[in-house]
Amino acid sequence: MSSVTLTTTTTTTSTPPKPTPKDEPQEQIYTPWRLFIYDIWVLGIVSTLAWGCRISTYLIPLFRSNVGKKHLDIGAGTGYYLNQARISSTTQLTIVDNETHALNVALARCKHPVTQTHGIVTDILQPSPFPETYLTNNDQKFDSVSMYYLLHCLPVPVASKCKIFTHLKKYMTEDGVVHGANVLGKGVRKDNWFARIIRRGCLNHGVFHNEEDNAYEFERALRENFWEVETWVVGSVFVFRAKRPILDA
């Protein structure tokens, strides 16, 4: 029998935070029908024609080859990558998002008769986004972490986005791997007409916050926190895989 649970966590209290006006746009963006459209429009048409990165060619193979026995997926979206990755029934899967609608959709999509699936509502930008037991209990640490098309949506400077890798490595095993992709806003090829329209719309509507996001700073942050780092720029997309976190003594 499958096990699907949902938890809310914060760094200061055990009760869920009250919604704020700032959270409300995300509630509107991640309604179920828009999440369905997301798969077709964003991951299919826009990623290929605007950003020059075909998901099925570049990102799904990377995802499939880097899922461990205890996997953490950050930024649930629609659960598309997890669904396409053909997660093993023996994998313990934890899905994280700061928005309940998206997380519930991903959890429902990834249900498996055997797989143990756990959902957490939390803010990944916080220094300690998970309960203390994830730090003290090695059995709860993750051997693989994924974050696809997440970083360009976070409304913080690129330096704050880079700190996520510092926070995450504390929750990973010694041989753990983190992998993902995000749309860059700086130091990439010139946008075609379609990309210009999409980028302008995403920025104006607060979907993208990536004007200063660049490959150099992301790669530097990865190399500061992991022993083995591989990065690629595919079209306007930064793709990465980093292994073996540099853990503090």
Swiss-Prot record:
The gene that this protein is the product of is adaD
To which protein family does this belong?
Answer: Belongs to the methyltransferase superfamily.
Residues spanning the signal sequence: none
Asked if Nucleotide-binding is a keyword of the record, the answer is no
UniProt-recorded name of the protein = O-methyltransferase adaD
Q: Choose any GO biological process term that the UniProt entry carries and state it.
A: methylation
Q: Which UniProt keywords apply?
A: Methyltransferase, Transferase
Transferase: present as a keyword of the record? yes
Q: Which GO terms describe its molecular function?
A: methyltransferase activity
Pfam families in alphabetical order: Methyltransf_31
Taxonomy, superkingdom:
Eukaryota
Q: Which Enzyme Commission numbers does its entry carry?
A: 2.1.1.-
Q: What does the function comment of this entry state?
A: O-methyltransferase; part of the gene cluster that mediates the biosynthesis of the linear tetracyclic TAN-1612 neuropeptide Y receptor antagonist. The decaketide backbone of TAN-1612 is synthesized by the non-reducing polyketide synthase adaA via condensation of one acetyl-CoA starter unit with 9 malonyl-CoA units. The FAD-dependent monooxygenase adaC then performs hydroxylation at C2 while the polaketide chain is still attached to the NRPKS adaA.
Which portions of the chain have biased composition (kind: Low complexity)? Answer: 1-15
Region Disordered, residue ranges = 1-26
| Phylogenetic lineage | Eukaryota, Fungi, Dikarya, Ascomycota, Pezizomycotina
* Pathway annotation: Secondary metabolite biosynthesis
Q: Which reaction does it catalyse?
A: 2-acetyl-3,4a,8,10,11,12a-hexahydroxy-1,4,4a,5,12,12a-hexahydrotetracene-1,12-dione + S-adenosyl-L-methionine = TAN-1612 + S-adenosyl-L-homocysteine + H(+)
